[in-house]
Amino acid sequence: MRKDFGAKPYTYPQPVLMIATYGEDGKPDVMNAAWGGISDDKEISICVSENHKTTENILKKGAFTVSMADVEHMTACDYVGIVSGNKEPDKFEKAGFTAEKSDKVDAPIIKELPICVECKLKSYDKETCRLIGEIVNVSVDES
């Protein structure tokens, strides 16, 4: 038996999106986003409030990467979603992640995660918290 829910934005299950940036000091930062997805051929949309360290970095640097969490790294991915970069500046390293500089955008690739979408900031709406990135490249670990 099915239950109707009406017109809702349900596209579950969703991947856990890991948003990575560099701070002004060059340190990598990462958080997980509760909502996001592909919104056009070369566009990704993510809802992130402006009080996140990661959002601040994106607005200053104009770039970010989006990696997909995997089962092997779920604990680390959960950790960076719970701990604030404003309070714990070394959370990227404490999670056990290794940063590799993207040669396409000014943002880190998380070496441990298999898929990375490299993006340039296209727009950010403070009212709706909607961040839109232009997809510049997608890299996949072949191992």
Where do the language-model regions lie?
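Active-site-proximal mixed secondary-structure blocks
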Residues: 1-31, 37-143
